[in-house]
């Protein structure tokens, strides 16, 4: 029995409304497996590959290179089994007619981020998913925000409630820090759990967010069900201190770009808009001081200040790293006590973005067990 699938323009992040087709990676007639990269798409924020959520044969490339299409628009038709061209024509025609009829300003916008006073400061967070299972909290890294999880959040929320937050000093949360240390950030995560009436949660942290997650588990072990640590700080001594210093000091695009490209194995992922957005953030009142405080709290030159490996043995843990990480070496993945470890050789420090499908599948499997 044949099945005709439609591949559509994904929505990456809260603000994405459209994407431009950059290049097709698979051609008509090619066999596609679930998780394969089918085409490259560029948005005003980032460039990435669209992965197939199903298997089959790519029968029709509907979108053309350089074509800009709204979120949800038809990109391609993939067929499992056999299908006549007339059947594919009918699917395309029906999709296009219904998509035009349902689009426009009246279309539902979906969930939006929330803001509230939490632990004495304004905090922004974004929730997806239902009430089934223990909730998961996503904690971003130094200089990031909740959008660092834009390729992961929807997939992870298919099986549980998932909350991504902006840490103090970041995103749209309050910028002023008091002590500017790991405990202050960790206390904010615990305050958010209290605010949301979550007694116990899985924590997933990237980079500095991994150290925050480990520290939360050390401060309040009864509140943490498991740890998913993505290119995490706190698992070894070495760190690229020049990156931290360069990122903090960068005041224009030319100074910022050499720092940002170190985050990715593929420097082409650093778009002009990504740089502009980061510069806008860095120019907000209070951001410079917050980043300087946190950089000092994280590292002394090329040496991390916090060794949190002892916490690993107290909770189920998944450790994920990109083999081409230029910020924190992937060798740290195997330095801690017993934990599940996944090293993706072709990814960099932003491994959860560069290898989203592999990271998502590993995390989903890990979370189901715990």
From Swiss-Prot:
Chain positions with N6-lipoyllysine modification: 45
Listed cofactors: (R)-lipoate
Reaction(s) the record says it catalyses: N(6)-[(R)-dihydrolipoyl]-L-lysyl-[protein] + acetyl-CoA = N(6)-[(R)-S(8)-acetyldihydrolipoyl]-L-lysyl-[protein] + CoA
Gene Ontology biological-process annotations: acetoin catabolic process
GO CC annotations on file: membrane
EC numbers on record: 2.3.1.12
UniProt keywords, alphabetically: Acetoin catabolism, Acyltransferase, Lipoyl, Transferase
Protein name, entry field: Dihydrolipoyllysine-residue acetyltransferase component of acetoin cleaving system
Phylogenetic lineage: Bacteria, Pseudomonadati, Pseudomonadota, Gammaproteobacteria, Pseudomonadales
